[in-house]
Amino acid sequence: MSSDLYANAVLYSEISQRNPELVSKMFNEATRKKLDAFLKDNEAPKLKDIVTDNVFKKRKRIASSSGNEPPVKKMAAKDSSDSDSSDDGAVKKNGVQKPVNVAAKKSATPVQKKAESSSSSDSDAPAKKLTPVKKPAQTPAQKKAASSSDSDSDDEPPKKAPAVTTKVAPKPMAKKQDTSDSDSDSEDSDDGKSKKANPVKVTPVANVLQKVVAKKAASSSSDSSDDEKKPAAKPTPAKPTPKPVVKKAESSSDSSDDEKKPVAKPAPAKATPKPAAKKADSSSDSSDDEAPAKKTPAKAAPKPVAKKAESSSDSSDDEKKPAAKPTPAKATPKPVAKKAESSSDSSDDEKKPVAKPAPAKATPKPVAKKAESSSDSSDDEKKPAAKPTPAKATPKPVAKKAESSSDSSDDEKKPVAKPTSAKATPKPAAKKADSSSDSSDDEAPAKKTPAKAAPKPASKKAESSSDSSDDEKPAAKSTPAKITPKPTAKKVASSSSDSSDDEKKPAAKPTPANATPKPVAKKAESSSDSSDDEKKPVAKPTSAKATPKPAAKKADLSSDFSDDEAPAKKTPAKAAPKPASKKAESSSDSSDDEKPAAKSTPAKTTPKPTAKKAASSSSDSSDDEKKPVAKPTSAKATPKPAAKKADSSSDSSDDEAPAKKTPVKPTPVKIVAKKVDSSSDSSDDEKKPTKATPVKVTPKSVTKKAAASSSDSSDDEKKPVVKQTPNVVPKKEKAASSSDDSSDDEKKPTAKPTPKATPKQSAKKADSSDDSSDDEAPAKKTPAKSTPAKTAVKKEASSSSDDSSDDEKTKKKSATTPAKSTPKTALKKAESSDSSDDDEDLPKPSKAVTPRPQRADSEESAETEESSSRTPALKAKPLATSTEKAVYENRKRKSSPFRRVQMTKDSVSEKFRNNQHDSHFDQWGQRANESLGKVVGKAFRHEKTKKKKGSYGGGPINQSINSIKFSDSDD
């Protein structure tokens, strides 16, 4: 009899006894028949015979000791075991694999048991007892898992029982895989072997199957990367008892990862050795990688840092599996180093589990890897190599922070992922690809990361902010620092990604302070991450690199928008380190909490904080809702406004929120570029790049403006208050801060880009339709950033679109500044029309209308139409009414009583002219008709009543339907 059959028979009999319901799910009919027949002829040993009670007890003891946090570990283990089961399933060659898949699905039940067994490698045996449930889920997986995972070293000793033969066959295969995997983790695996061998020995066949699976899960969870590399790593988990944290992190990461893609793991495990390859894989295997990433994390297990990274990488996995939450607890223990790496590895792990181990061993490499990884996420597709260079050791922590910020929104989504997220974030690039899955993950990590990130405030924070987006594009961050030119390119890409990134990783903003170019790129990445995380769109990473992907981003953004809101909140926690910035953020946090990430970034840009704060303050009132803090970054991001703008449009919803902020922030006009940016950043936070772009490209700014105006429409709607403030503040600063961009923009941009505005307005308008909300926000940003001239245009766009209400308020100011206003007004008004929402929102359109005369363009016409639609329309109606009234009254005002319409037979169609009763089929009707036909008026009613009340004296009543079908032509 084949070892597989024997093992299956043991499992089958055990499961049928303990949890019969699972049998049908784990074994198909053919298999069941086969096993039944086999069991008739041969009596399969029982688990009790294979595994002694005393081993179970031992294991149990170990289990409890192995993790003081059994629940967490168990959960993680559960997930990991689950994934293991699936993994094993993948390894399995037999048809059992199918059952495995089922088992994986069912892992919930098995998982519990498995959780126990997996919770501690040692506890696996006892878990086995419980395993019955577990067994079903893992049976195939277990067997094969056992063989595959046990094959490492577990199986051989455990197999001593009948299992030896049983599992031996599978072992080779599993072992092979494991071997490749275990090669990297040979040490761990060896240790695990020794450890495993002892407990496992007793666990033969059936037990081993489950145990192995459980163990595998445990090891996978504990040695997520080890596991991946070597299920044998299980022992390591046992060993790692001291490393419970690591284990847990891994476990959690494994849990979700395993759950997600246990199958993918094996391949990733192999891939691990080749980070580059893995990276490639990682992009393609973003989801797969997640599962593999888990394994890789396991590898990292020996190396706390790596492990944590794994944990973080698992974070995204965790995202999928709340089990990851427990991991956070453990993950916390190995804070900085681990976290940094973990963060960098987090996304990397997801994408390149292999990379993770490397990072663990060599932080420098991890950074590079991270860079790659992050670059992988957005750049991976584009230029992972470039990013590695930027990757710095510090970046990791920063990455973490970035993760944290990026995670902030993610955190909201998946608090569980938090621990892992923190780590996962670091490898945003990879993560980015995985980002969608990581998005929630990041959220969780964000929380943790902030705490840790705090330690490395200056570099980390700066980097962190940069990392925020950098996390996704660490390379971008580093590279920008190293290579400004690249930053630009990157920035553009990042810019587009920034829009959402900003929301997600305002931290990037602070970095901008450090490196204006970088921030943008980072931000782009960050934003890319935010939405990427949520959506996992590969396009996003690309978009980070290539503005062209804004569309994709936009889609992402929409998802990001909600995501970002969550992250923003978390990010603020991070931001805490920088009081000033934070304060601004704080105010902005009130409503900005939704987008604290942006704030965090501002926090980082402490230098700008004061100005920002002021802007933040005024803008915060209403902008708080949106993220005034982000503005600082905007200033930096300025360079990549164009790209950002695209992103901005992408960030329609995001921008809306930011847009509001933007007006607020521009308090100081002098900082105008920056502050405007800052104000614009508020929305720019979400769309920092937008502003930046305006500075660089006035034309773009105009375009942006239009877009912004349209997007602002929502923003304006959202935050008319802020705009009102602008009204009050005619001064540039005040205008900037209060009007935000409204008066500021008007004043500044007024003279500036009328020409540009007009042409771009068209484009913008188009954009605005697309990015109605988004563009508005970006527009605001853009204006802020635009060079004075550009700023004028931008601001105008910003003020006009951003502050549609502002615009109108501003327009008053605009009117005040006729010279400037005229060009601006045109643009603005055009934008105003673009931000029809804004105009609609605010009765200011009339104001807008006032400047309108100055705008002589389609813009004016459009705006006029809009305001007209509001005010003019109303006015028009009155006029029409007055004229019509006279005529109407003349006709109507004859004091004549209401009279019935006189119908002449000529006006009735032939079909209906004869209204006579057709009595040839209805005697009763005929009789009634005779009496009723002669009567008209009140008498008819009387006659009819008599007929109704009288006794029926006719024949059968005809119940056929004699109605007439009217056709349209028969009117």
Swiss-Prot record:
InterPro entries annotated for this entry?
Answer: Nopp140-like, Srp40_C
Q: Where is the composition biased (Basic and acidic residues)?
A: 907-921
Primary subcellular site in the record, as a coarse category: nucleus
Composition bias of kind Low complexity appears in 134-150, 264-275, 294-304, 324-335, 355-366, 386-397, 417-428, 447-457, 476-498, 508-519, 539-550, 569-579, 598-620, 630-641, 691-712, 751-761, 780-791, 815-825
Q: Name one GO cellular component term.
A: nucleolus
Q: Name one GO biological process term.
A: dauer larval development
Note the superkingdom of the native organism. Eukaryota
Amino acid composition bias (Acidic residues), ranges on this chain: 180-190
Could you say which tissues express the protein in this record? Expressed in the nerve ring and hypodermal tissues. Expressed in the intestine. Expressed in the germline.
Q: Which Pfam families match?
A: SRP40_C
Identify the stretch(es) annotated as Disordered.
61-926, 938-971
Composition bias type Polar residues, residue spans: 957-971
Q: Which GO terms fall under molecular function for this chain's record?
A: rDNA binding; RNA polymerase I core binding
| Keyword Nucleus assigned | yes
Q: Where is the composition biased (Basic residues)?
A: 939-950
Q: What are the record keywords, sorted?
A: Nucleus
Subcellular location, record wording: Nucleus, Nucleolus; Nucleus, Nucleoplasm
The family database entries (PANTHER family) matched by this protein are listed as:
NUCLEOLAR AND COILED-BODY PHOSPHOPROTEIN 1
| Assembly with partners or alone | May form dimers. Interacts with RNA polymerase I.
* Function summary: Nucleolar protein which binds to RNA polymerase I and rDNA and is required for efficient RNA polymerase I-mediated rDNA transcription. Maintains the epigenetically active status of rDNA chromatin which facilitates rDNA transcription and sustains germline development, ensuring fertility. Plays a role in the modulation of nucleolus size. May play a role in the regulation of lifespan.
Q: Which family does it belong to?
A: Belongs to the NOLC1 family.
**By what name is this protein known?**
Nucleolar protein dao-5
Species for this entry: Caenorhabditis elegans
Q: What is the lineage of its organism?
A: Eukaryota, Metazoa, Ecdysozoa, Nematoda, Chromadorea
